[in-house]
Design a protein with these regions (language model features):
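Residues lining hydrophobic/aromatic ligand-binding pockets adjacent to catalytic sites
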Residues: 1-144
Length: 144
């Protein structure tokens, strides 16, 4: 029996999200629905020093946009700030080299939406932590 999972493309999702991907034969990004404001699509709770705060990548605030159409705001500058925050917080972690590798592989020049950013990072993380090939489907039903 084949298993299919469907989730919105979250911003640096939690471990359970990746367990769902791992246990699926096909994973579908649900990104052709309205962008849910104040959600995990563009932010996540993250530990900085000894406190928990929000880590996010700012987006352009347009109402009634689909997730796949929400554009990043000042993407180059904000991405550099994001990398610095993550690096500062995780540089002592034994697996930091993997995080650093993913952050440096993100083609920020070619990414224009939060959807593209999230899908790239989710697939990059999944490729590192899983040995099996995962099939991903986009909003138009195309394999990625």
């Amino acid at each position: 029996m084949k298993s299919i999972s469907i989730m919105q493309p979250h911003f640096f999702p939690w471990f359970g999200y990746f367990e769902l991907i791992k246990n699926s034969d096909l994973f579908i990004f649900l990104d052709d629905i309205e962008f849910p404001h104040r959600s995990y699509v563009n932010r996540v709770k993250f530990q900085f020093q000894n406190k928990i705060d929000w880590l996010s990548l700012p987006i352009k605030r347009d109402s009634n946009k689909l997730i796949k159409d929400v554009k990043l705001f000042n993407k180059k500058e904000n991405f550099e700030l994001l990398k610095k925050k993550i690096s500062y917080s995780l540089k002592k972690n034994k697996n930091y080299h993997l995080v650093d590798r993913i952050l440096n592989e993100i083609p920020i020049e070619e990414i224009f939406t939060i959807n593209e950013f999230n899908k790239f990072t989710i697939k990059a993380i999944a490729s590192i932590i899983f040995k099996k090939k995962i099939k991903f489907l986009d909003y138009a039903g195309r394999l990625q």
